[in-house]
Amino acid sequence: GATLDAWEKVVDATDESERAALVNEMLAATTAHPRMTNHVGSGWHLHYRDDGRPLGAVLSSLISVGTALHLTGRGMHRLSRCAVAECAAVFADTSRTGRQRYCSQRCANRDAVRRHRARGVPPVR
């Protein structure tokens, strides 16, 4: 839907300013003023949306706020696509060093094997 299309534009943004502008557009379109709530006795927490919104609107709000919190808290570069050309998966880099390149260990291993084979080293038997 429209939310995921907008989110993919954030992922594919070429610089921090563009990424921030796109996230700000998502926030403006999907969120309300933040407020504290303790509905149904679930404990105090923040809501970034109006009560009674349909599920799609709630999810759009969560995606935009979550993305903004991740990028401002972890770093603007920590949202990316997998480095494996055949994989278009998106991942949020939560690594300690901020240098995650792959969406999964499987893709990291596949790319390591591809690079090893490209060097022309005969397989160990």
Residue ranges of model-derived segments:
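C-terminal structured interaction module
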Residues: 95-97, 115
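Cysteine-rich micro-motifs
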Residues: 97-108
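Short helix-coil boundary/hinge micro-motifs
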Residues: 1-93, 122-125
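Short metal-binding segments enriched for Cys and/or His
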Residues: 110-122
